[in-house]
Amino acid sequence: AEQGYSDAQSNLGLMYEEGKGVVQDYVEALKWYRLAAAQGQAQAQYNLGLMYDQGKGVGQDDVEALKWFRLAATQGLPHAQYNLGLMYDQGKGVMQNYAEAVEWFRLAAAQRQPLAQYNLGLMYEKGKGVRQDYAEAAKWYKFAAMQGHVPAQYNLGLIYDHGKGVAQDFASAAKWYRLAAVEGQASAQYKLGLMYDEGKGVAQDFSEAVKWYRLAAAQGIAPAQSNLGLMFGRG
């Protein structure tokens, strides 16, 4: 790193940031990231952007974060492309621009970045920066869901449940709700409970319904609490 190798500088920065083999030191991490980033090392540019984004070792600065995310993103780094998309989506450090957000999400999603795939699905579902298209939303949710992205699994369950952009399919809805529910997603737990309660996509099973309602209710999902009350009320 002392000899100017950008990959070594970037790795040393990460060691200081995470406190691996050295005492954790954000200022020292920044120093090495800067040296590597100035040589065009994409990962260091991205990590430097994160430091500014999170205010680690430096004052929080959206404009600087955006600058470094952009430099890494234009080199094709998917995490940087996703974060740049997020900045445009939220109007952080730049004028809010949904169409621009979509383009960066799309580039990262094409590289199988699950957060970008999920966010691209959201943009299509809501019609933000693109024409509303439930079939496209379902496509991108599925890519993210298959990589274990929990909110995408839940949203995909909803899409199958309501038949938005896909043929209505309660069994598929239950499958995706279950994957999200097992990971603790409260709304998915409630929906899965409902499927068991009503026998939609699964064999009707009141004890399973109670199990999932309980889990959702414990996380504050009001309909799960009221359905649980109704089930106990009817014995």
Where are these regions (language model features)?
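Short helix-capping/linker turns of helical repeat alpha-solenoids
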Residues: 3-5, 18-20, 25, 38-41, ...
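N-terminal segments that cap or nucleate solenoid repeat domains
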Residues: 1-15
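Hydrophobic face of amphipathic alpha-helices that form TPR/SEL1-like repeat modules
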Residues: 11-18, 47-54, 83-90, 119-126, ...
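Long tandem-repeat architectures and their stereotyped inter-repeat linkers in very large proteins
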Residues: 31, 35-38, 42, 67, ...
